[in-house]
Structure formats: C-alpha cells, structure tokens
C-alpha cells in the first residue's frame, strides 16, 4: 500500500460515522466515541491433532483471506479422550489492526457476506456486554481470495470485532453504521 492511501471504510468512519454516533449518544468528549480496535480471525482445526498436515491448509487459507501470516495455536493441556497432547497444533489465529483491519472489514461486508447462500443477516445478540461482537462463518469459500476448486475441505472460522464501546448498544450502533447486516427485529428466524 502506498503512503497516502487510506481505506475507504476508515475514511467513512472518520468523516461520517463518528459524527452520527456523537449525535446519537451525545458524548462529552470526542475520545469517547466508539471505534474499532482490532479484528481477530480464529480458525479451529481440531482434526489437526490426528493429522498434522491439516493445519497447513488452515494457515494457507487464513493467509490468503487476511493478508497476514497466522499464529499457530497449540493445546494448553492434554486430553486423553480427544487423543490430544500438550503442544499439539489445534488452530490458527490472526489479529488485524490498522489499515489491514479496515481493508478486511470492507471486503467482509461488501464482498464476502453477500456471497453467502441464503444469508438473512447477522444475529445482533452476539455481543459480549462490552461492545465487542463475535460471529462465526461455516466455510471459507465466500472470500474471493480462496479458489473454490482448490479447497480440500470446508473450514469455518470465528471473527471477533473488538471495539472501544462501553456497552452493547454503542457497539451495535457502531457496527450498524459501518455496514454490518444485522437481522431485522420483525423478521422470522
């Protein structure tokens, strides 16, 4: 990325969304206006305990999707019933901050989520009480960086959007303004 390039979602947040949120919640200080701190993309690969090559596919997919090399997550303790030993790789995680985070959110909202078959919106009850939002995707094929013909197996992932909001209402308002497609209250499940 060049020096003077700013992601369009970041520009929209700075120029429009902050003013709307300030008008809606009337903050005393501009630093109280909620913003997005980081986005964590986690891909659990429980089968990697039996076949260690499976983690490589998850790492490859996450690298393509996020543009950043994932951190391999290992088992913290052994569980005999799952044939799991301490230190075995069981997942991969990427933490996105700054411009990469804004680019990922933009691609997620404008390209990936609309490509999901029978997508009716995200559940708006999955906030943690502090304005952070977590949702899961069942497979990786909706990202255009992934070649559908080369997918060895469908892999789901959890995406957590960490915000500076103090409660769920502020977080929900921020994400709705950013363009997160939440389900409408009146629609049937």
Curated annotation (Swiss-Prot):
GO terms for cellular component: ribonucleoprotein complex; ribosome. The keyword Repressor does not apply. InterPro entries: Ribosomal_uL5 (IPR002132), Ribosomal_uL5_bac-type (IPR020930), Ribosomal_uL5_C (IPR031309), Ribosomal_uL5_dom_sf (IPR022803), Ribosomal_uL5_N (IPR031310). Gene3D superfamilies: 3.30.1440.10. GO terms for biological process: translation. Keywords: Ribonucleoprotein, Ribosomal protein, RNA-binding, rRNA-binding, tRNA-binding. GO terms for molecular function: rRNA binding; structural constituent of ribosome; tRNA binding. Part of the 50S ribosomal subunit; part of the 5S rRNA/L5/L18/L25 subcomplex. Contacts the 5S rRNA and the P site tRNA. Forms a bridge to the 30S subunit in the 70S ribosome. This is one of the proteins that bind and probably mediate the attachment of the 5S RNA into the large ribosomal subunit, where it forms part of the central protuberance. In the 70S ribosome it contacts protein S13 of the 30S subunit (bridge B1b), connecting the 2 subunits; this bridge is implicated in subunit movement. Contacts the P site tRNA; the 5S rRNA and some of its associated proteins might help stabilize positioning of ribosome-bound tRNAs. Belongs to the universal ribosomal protein uL5 family. This is Large ribosomal subunit protein uL5. The lineage of its organism: Bacteria, Bacillati, Actinomycetota, Actinomycetes, Mycobacteriales. The gene is rplE.
């Amino acid at each position: 990325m060049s020096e003077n390039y700013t992601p369009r979602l970041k520009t929209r947040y700075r120029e429009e969304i902050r003013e709307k949120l300030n008008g809606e919640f009337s903050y005393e200080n501009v630093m109280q206006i909620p913003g997005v701190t980081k986005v964590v993309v986690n891909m659990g690969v429980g089968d990697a305990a039996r076949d260690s090559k499976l983690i490589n596919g998850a790492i490859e997919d996450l690298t393509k999707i996020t543009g950043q090399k994932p951190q391999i997550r290992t088992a913290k303790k052994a569980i005999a019933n799952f044939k799991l030993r301490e230190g075995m790789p069981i997942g991969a995680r990427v933490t996105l901050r700054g411009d990469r985070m804004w680019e990922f959110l933009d691609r997620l909202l404008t390209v990936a989520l609309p490509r999901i078959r029978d997508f009716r919106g995200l559940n708006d009850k999955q906030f943690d009480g502090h304005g952070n939002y977590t949702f899961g995707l069942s497979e990786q094929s909706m990202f255009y960086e992934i070649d559908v013909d080369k997918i060895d197996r469908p892999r789901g992932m959890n995406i957590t959007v960490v915000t500076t909001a103090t409660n769920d209402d502020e977080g929900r308002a921020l994400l709705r303004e950013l363009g997160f497609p939440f389900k409408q209250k009146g629609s049937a499940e």
